[in-house]
């Protein structure tokens, strides 16, 4: 089995073959258009290599991908799985020094937090209802005294 070429490479090969078959001085405008299109496709695909994300661009990409969940700069690991751990690679190692794809970015998103289900009014307890203002009972400070006589209890 042969190696599968990319589409721009195949188009370039086809265009190059067509170009060699046709004499330059009798080339029609449609052939020139297709040749130019093939050359542009080939050159733009070879110059645009894999991109890396660093600094603010990396943070912006993570915020876009993860949304309100948030993200980690290091991969989250289990608690105390082993005393000695191998050095971890973070998102900067994977996406700034090398190129990374969308799936790699999603690996650093925080997990979804479960949302609290809104309770219906029927399910609420009576203590959840707003309290009405109660009568204020003043403490009887004159306990044990009647008139000007003081009694001890």
UniProtKB/Swiss-Prot annotation:
Induction remark: Expression in the bone oscillates in a circadian manner and its expression is negatively regulated by CCRN4L/NOC.
Subcellular location: Secreted
Composition-biased stretches (Basic and acidic residues): 125-138
Annotated region (Disordered), positions in chain: 120-153
GO-annotated molecular function: growth factor activity; hormone activity; insulin receptor binding; insulin-like growth factor receptor binding; integrin binding; receptor ligand activity; transmembrane receptor protein tyrosine kinase activator activity
Covalent S-S links between cysteines: 54-96, 66-109, 95-100
A Pfam family reported for this protein in Swiss-Prot or TrEMBL: Insulin
Segments of this protein annotated with the region D: 111-118
UniProt region (C), positions on chain: 78-89
Region ranges (B): 49-77
PROSITE patterns per the UniProt record, alphabetical: INSULIN (PS00262)
This protein's GO CC annotations: alphav-beta3 integrin-IGF-1-IGF1R complex; exocytic vesicle; extracellular space; glutamatergic synapse; insulin-like growth factor ternary complex; neuronal dense core vesicle lumen; postsynapse
InterPro entries: IGF-I, Insulin-like, Insulin-like_growth_factor, Insulin-like_sf, Insulin_CS, Insulin_family
Subunit structure of this chain's protein: Forms a ternary complex with IGFR1 and ITGAV:ITGB3. Forms a ternary complex with IGFR1 and ITGA6:ITGB4. Interacts with SH2D3C isoform 2. Forms a ternary complex with IGFBP3 and ALS.
Stated role: The insulin-like growth factors, isolated from plasma, are structurally and functionally related to insulin but have a much higher growth-promoting activity. May be a physiological regulator of [1-14C]-2-deoxy-D-glucose (2DG) transport and glycogen synthesis in osteoblasts. Stimulates glucose transport in bone-derived osteoblastic (PyMS) cells and is effective at much lower concentrations than insulin, not only regarding glycogen and DNA synthesis but also with regard to enhancing glucose uptake. May play a role in synapse maturation.
UniProt protein name: Insulin-like growth factor 1
The encoding gene: Igf1
């Amino acid at each position: 089995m042969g190696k599968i070429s990319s589409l721009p490479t195949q188009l370039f090969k086809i265009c190059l073959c067509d170009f060699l078959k046709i004499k330059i001085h009798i080339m029609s405008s449609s052939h020139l258009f297709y040749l130019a299109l093939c050359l542009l496709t080939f050159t733009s695909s070879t110059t645009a290599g894999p991109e890396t994300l660093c600094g603010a661009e990396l943070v912006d990409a993570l915020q876009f991908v993860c949304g309100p969940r948030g993200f980690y700069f290091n991969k989250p690991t289990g608690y105390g799985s082993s005393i000695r751990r191998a050095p971890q690679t973070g998102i900067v190692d994977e996406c700034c020094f090398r190129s990374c794809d969308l799936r790699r970015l999603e690996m650093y998103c925080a997990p979804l937090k479960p949302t609290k289900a809104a309770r219906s009014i029927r399910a609420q307890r009576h203590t959840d209802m707003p309290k009405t203002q109660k009568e204020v009972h003043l403490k009887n400070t004159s306990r044990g005294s009647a008139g000007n006589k003081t009694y001890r209890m």
